[in-house]
């Protein structure tokens, strides 16, 4: 039975967050095992391990119910629903246990969740669609006595966080307007002044979460053209027109936000806490957002601010479920430090940096994304109420 509608993100990361939090999921993709390819000759051993049951997810209207589990669950999840899938184990008290995430379609994955004796059900969470509950199944004879678990965060709780974050972000829009107009004014001056104003704008723009792309009002991507012109051999005044257009777009967006409401959709909120840094790793560090300024440290500072502000709003919620956020904030501080250090050291593209410094930044960003991953998971595994 379909129980409630959510628009969950397809890309989730899972990690063990505390002795009381959700246990780490099976991360390995399914592949044919040797026992699957053995001949059909009858076995002479009575203790031969049976083939894992297959849980078939055929559509978005039902979630398969496992047979009774003796000792240890070992399943193969086969998703042919047409949508990416996340599956987790839950009990009637509302606790979530273990998660199998990022099951594509069609795709087959092995899953061996560690569960103690008890009664459970599965919840299938479909990308941009529904969460569907299976019937109950039981586990008996398990050697596990304290399976890690988490009381799921509710939709109402996440929605409140999204509204709070949106209100705080809205207060900062006038700052973006100010920086945009300062940039437009600077294009009538010398190149160093105009470039400095651009970098100031860029850092402020990057300090907003990436859902700003969905704000009401015009597109705010015009900064790329300004950057190309200011770091070219063309006269500074050539950047005046796109800079004025950018300032006008920011003004129109500010007015639109005054008369309408926008907040990160609740099902996506946890993902947004680390999507900014993931996209920095995926795009900025590959040079795809370098339009001539070689301003990677500036972009990093803005992204760190964005991540902090998005995490601040949900911090008490995830800490209440057992997540220690102190290491996350420490790592963001480390990234800020690295950004300042490399801003002084480099004015070249990232691929021209020394290998040692590239690896240092790559490692620090990857660590931040690793630490942020449980926030996404904890806000998508939600009680169905």
Residue ranges and their predicted role:
Residues 77-81:
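Asparagine-centered strand-capping/turn motif at beta-strand->loop junctions
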Residues 142-385:
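Mature extracytoplasmic or organellar-lumen-exposed domains after removal of signal/transit peptides
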Residues 21-25:
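Boundary at the C-terminal end of the N-terminal hydrophobic targeting segment
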Residues 53, 71-75:
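Structural beta-strand segments of beta-rich domains
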Residues 84-86, 94-101, 327:
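Surface-exposed loop/edge segments in extracytoplasmic proteins
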Residues 32-38, 42-58, 103-148:
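Extracellular/periplasmic metallocenter environments
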Residues 60-68:
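Short beta-strand segments of immunoglobulin-like
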Residues 2-19:
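Gram-negative bacterial Sec-dependent N-terminal signal peptides
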